Structures are given as C-alpha cells and as structure tokens.
A protein has these predicted regions:
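A conserved short coil-to-beta-strand element within the FAD-binding core of flavoproteins
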Residues: 162-177
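Glycine-/small-residue-rich beta->alpha transition segments that form the dinucleotide
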Residues: 194-206, 233, 265, 351
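C-terminal catalytic lobe of FAD-dependent flavoproteins
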Residues: 107, 127, 142-148, 152, ...
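Hydrophobic/small residue at the entry helix of a nucleotide-binding pocket
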Residues: 1-2
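Glycine-rich FAD pyrophosphate-binding loop
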Residues: 10-31
Length: 474
C-alpha cells in the first residue's frame, strides 16, 4: 500500500517521503503466496461485486506488467464428501471466467482419469473429478515487485528510506504534521514536517494510529497464514489446488525448482507470529493425503518457511466473535480520510488490488487540498515500448542470450528486463565491458555477477537478508 501510494503521488507531482521501519516489503508482502487472483473463493459467499473488482484488477495487472505477471492454470481435485458436486463448481468457474470478461483461458471440467493422466502426482483414489481454471502469479516474488514500485517512486523524486521508524506524529496549530523518526540501526532521531500523513503500515496501521492519537472508522483483525517451501513436487507449471480438511483452499505453488505448499488460516491477536509445530503438521498432513509421493513429505524436507498475517478490515465497533463471521471476512481494503486533520489510513488490501489503492490515495490527497500538477499521469506499468526495443536491439547486437548459463531457467535478456526494466540497459554495458559479469554468482542459480553490483549500488540493501530474501531469489 505504501509503495503504490508513494509512486502514484510522486509521479503526479506531489512531494513525498516514504518511511519504512524495516526493509521494504519486509513483513506481509514477503510472506505472500505470490498469487494475483480474482478472488474465486468469494464466489461461495456471493460477493460478486468484489470478485468483479478483483478480476478487473488482475486483468489490469496482467496487461500492465506482462513480463512480471503471468497467467497460470489452477488444477483442482475434489474428493468424495465435498460440500458441492464437481459440475457445480465447474459452473462456478465458468461464471468466474465470465465475471473476468473472459480474459484468461477458459475453464475445463476434469474427470478422475484426466486428473491422473495430466498430474499423476495427485492422489485420485477418492476423487470425484475436478476442474481447471486460470488466474495469475508473480514470476519473481511479491517483495521484488514491491521494490520495483519503490524504485519508480524514487525516479519521480520521492524520498524513500528503510530502517527508519516513525515514533508518532503531532499536528501543530498551523495545521502542519511533525513526525519524529528514528534510525533503527544507530538510534539517531530527527523530525520531518508534512501537510498530510498517510498511514500505510499494513498490519500495524492501528498501532501507528494509537501512537499519533488518531481515531478511525475501521480497524484490523488478523489471520495467520503459513507456507512451507519443499523440493519440487511436479515440474508442470501449474498450481495444484485442493480443499484441506478444514474446507479451505489449499495450494501447491510452483516456485522455480521448489514448491510452496499452504496455507493455513488461524485467528491471531497480533501481527507478530511464528510457525508452530501444529502449523507444520497441518500442512504436511494435508499435502501428503492428496498426493502420490514415493515418500511422504516430512519436516526434514522443509527448505524454508513463510509466516505472515492477513490484515482483515472490520468496523471499529465490530466484534466478529463467531467462526462463521470470521470465515466470511474478505481482503477488501478501506481508506479512512480525516479531512479535518489531513490524515489518511489504509486498511487491509491485497496485491491484486494495488493499482486501485494508488488511484484512491491520489483522489483522497486532492480531497485534502493537495494539488497534483500531473493528475492524469500514468504511474504504473513497464517502460515504454521504445525503451524495450532499444534494450532488445542492444541484446541482439552483443549476443547476450548466448552467455546464458546451461542451468538457467530462462535466457538472460528476459530475466534482466523483467527485474530491472530500463535499468537493464546499464547492466548490458557492464557485461560488454567484462563478459565475466554474465556468469552466475552461485552455481545452480540464475543470479549473475553484474546483478550483485547493481544491488549494492542501487537497491538500498542494509542487511544480508534484504538481498537474499527480498531483492534476489537466492
């Protein structure tokens, strides 16, 4: 939310400062499933306007970021005793496709034999059929996608800093906000002044508002979700979709040479969470029941874990005590605007809807009297076609793709453009000067040496985790 808000406002002429207590995308975003989807699960609760909005947002992202966001098939197996018959869910998938303006490939009905023929790794012993439909995913990861927004914001003269914590904001008699900031690495404190405050602290929006004595119409409740990264389950580029023992959607998501399995949905009271033994066992039990593996997955197969919270939006006075009320909560976002104090809070939301959040914040800021001189300027999307053509021309002239290592998952030209956009042209110059810069940094990975130099110079890395976990896919 903060990254798109900063990019949209800076691109349209506002003077913007973006402050992050940790690293950019270092909390909820880095723990996401990397899926860009239209909310098919909300079909069951008849939230068709939300599904329509999310489908349109998904389509918009697919058009705007063709290198970074790709359509992917979701392959769904249903078992005996499921609450709906397969053909009914297939009809729902057809409706989902129609709600999304038929933008993706059409759904397909599957009988157990077809499921077994296409994905023999799926246990079809209790299968009653299934279906296949399309949504989208981030080819790299959520954290990298967010950082590319940060990079765009900086190119529009936004001041963006990580590892700087807000200690709270107060508004003086002249109507100006004063925010105390602290460097979390050396303890240095300083003050910044602004006409408007935008609280885009994700799961910590409520806590930040308390520090600044700000009351709002909405608040957050939290759902913990975990994913386990395990050795590759299938080399087919599709998401395997099941319904877990608790009835929720459950995925096995391709992740390069690995597979990410999850997720859980556990009500928690704080954004600070961790993976428990119960979480691990739930995921392992569910995936092992639904796959035909030579050897069941165990804790020794876990390469890494992801654990984060979904900030769910409710009215400030609501309780949502029952499980039924809890399960009906969606990932809709809300923007609270305090016109008197010139304060904005962004609650909830998901990656799929990020461009809408940026547009809504621009409208809200104008509502507060801030002039945006370039209010119609497009602030998102990949670089113009002319820049891409120049990049590809240089790629051809230097024979870049011939330098791609034998174990790479894609050619260098595709990878560098997706990750760096127009800045990839500078990487070509580095490789021309020294072809060794096109060699893998670590054998078995796609990351090449010139990218390390790029990261050190231009990607605001403070800790090794920033590089390993969020800027690269190592």
């Amino acid at each position: 939310n903060g990254a798109v808000a900063a990019t949209a406002l800076a691109a349209r002429g506002a003077k913007v400062a973006l402050v992050d207590k940790g690293d950019f995308a270092g909390f909820t975003s880095q723990n996401s499933s990397n899926l860009v989807w239209g909310g098919i699960k909300y079909m069951e609760t008849f939230e068709f306007p939300l599904v329509r909005q999310l489908c349109m947002s998904r389509n918009h992202l697919l058009r705007s970021y063709p290198s970074s966001i790709k359509e992917i098939r979701f392959f769904t197996n249903l078992e005996k005793g499921f609450r709906f018959p397969p053909f009914m869910l297939y009809c729902g998938a057809l409706l989902y496709w129609a709600i999304g303006n038929f933008f993706t490939r059409p759904p397909r009905f599957l009988i157990p034999r077809q499921i077994n023929n296409v994905e023999s790794v799926i246990n079809t012993e209790h299968s009653i059929g299934g279906f296949e439909y399309s949504d989208a995913f981030l080819y790299d990861n959520d954290a990298r996608f967010v950082f590319n927004f940060i990079r765009s914001a900086i190119s529009y003269n936004c001041t963006a800093v990580n590892y700087i914590e807000s200690l709270g904001s107060v508004r003086n008699e002249q109507g100006e906000w004063k925010t105390q900031l602290s460097n979390t690495k050396n303890g240095e404190t300083f003050e910044v002044r602004s006409s408007v405050i935008i609280n885009a602290c994700g799961p910590y929006v409520d806590q930040q508002n308390q520090v600044s004595n700000q009351t709002t119409e909405h608040r957050h409740v939290y759902s913990k979700g975990i994913h386990l990264v395990v050795p590759q389950i299938t080399n087919n580029e599709r998401v395997l979709t099941f319904f877990a023992d608790d009835g929720r959607l459950f995925f096995a998501i391709p992740m390069g040479g690995r597979t990410m399995v999850g997720t859980t949905d556990t009500r928690v009271s704080s954004p600070e969470t961790e993976v428990t033994e119960e979480d691990r066992q739930f995921v392992l039990d569910n995936i092992n029941k639904r796959l035909n593996l030579d050897k069941p997955l165990s804790e020794t197969d876990i390469i890494s874990e992801r654990c984060g919270v979904r900030p769910l939006v409710i009215k400030s006075g609501e309780k949502n005590n029952t499980n039924e009320e809890w399960m009906k909560l969606s990932r809709k976002h809300a923007v609270d605007v305090d016109c008197e104090k010139k304060h904005i809070s962004i609650f909830g939301g998901k990656l799929t809807d990020c461009l809408n959040v940026g547009e809504e914040i621009c409208e809200a800021v104008q509502q507060l009297g801030i002039h945006l001189p370039d209010e119609k300027r497009k602030w998102y999307g990949e670089p113009p076609e002319a820049i891409r053509n120049e990049y590809l021309n240089q790629v051809d002239l230097m024979g870049l793709d011939k330098l791609t290592s034998s174990g790479a998952s894609e050619v260098l030209s595709t990878r560098l453009w997706r990750r760096y956009g127009a800045q990839a042209i500078g990487l070509l110059e580095n490789i021309r000067e020294d072809p060794e810069m096109a060699k893998p940094l670590i054998e078995g990975t796609d990351y090449i040496r010139c990218e390390l130099t790029q990261a050190a110079r231009r990607e605001m890395i403070v800790t090794l985790e920033d590089f390993l976990r969020r800027r690269s896919k190592l």
